[in-house]
Amino acid sequence: MITRCTLLIYLSLVSLFAAAQRVQISGRLKESSVQSMSFGRIILNDTLQKFSKAYLASPEPGEGAKFLEHYKEFSKLSQDTAYIARPDTMHRFSITADLKDSLIFKSYQHITQRHAVSDLIKKDSIEIILLKQPCLPYQNCDQPAEKLYVFIAEKISVNYARDTLYCDRFSMDSKFDASYKIIKNLYGDFKGDSIKFTAYDHYGVPAFSHHKYVLLFVSKYCGKLFHEKYQYFDVYPTTNGRWASPGDPRRFNSSDTSRVQIEKIPFGTLNFDKIIDGVYHNMTFTSPYFKIEGNCVEPIMGAYAEELFEIKKKTVLKARGFFSEKQ
């Protein structure tokens, strides 16, 4: 029979053993190419990436409250010094970890390193030096766009891609490789059932990638296909055999003066989740375009894909040199 005194001793030993597994890792984190450390981070067990993949990657309709809870938790984690440490101006860092943990050392345009805590504590002193990624001379494309393709497509994949590091250039955008199935050509008559192109986005994952079907604008520069930055419409099949987008057709182009016809559109059984589509997909639901009942949003009015293309022709695409006044 375990006495109260024996139990207390046992619990104390367990507590001491658990505490003994926690260690303070202190050292210096430097970049090989510069004197100061501006972007360096030390991340415990790659916490942020694991959390994002597990809870934020693909929320389902009806899970709005749970998604918001996870999103708030992710925001807290990104600022929690228990999981993320940043070196000071003297390159010094300190973070508490378990003996079985790993630490991820990373910095912008430098090669990430991963070290086991059990290995780090064996060192007399810890100094992590991140090597700069190899760079190439920048080659500018001075030619105008060879071709513009406008089409309705279904998403196959949109994946983050490591961009080429140029020695004399500093990119503020992330690069993505996109692959889409062509459903209908509206302009440019792209030859092929599917298309692969590169997209750049300053704010993270391209917004168009959140939708299954989109009206896309892709141009060809120096033999390569690129998404016209930030230009897209989420579109949906209608019961009359066409494609349309619900909502204000000028929501992305407030300066448009064209007489685009906004009308009631038969979207069938299509509906949206007010929280998931509003937060995760960054959609806006306003009257008279949508009917809102609780968390369910029913699309009522919008414009067809051909009309949406006309808006882009007279605004952004024209400003980028694709269409003259006569067109």
Segments predicted by a language model, with ranges:
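Extracellular beta-sheet/turn segments enriched in Thr/Pro/Gly and aliphatic residues
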Residues: 119-138
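Basic, polyanion-binding surface patches
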Residues: 134-232, 316-320, 324-326
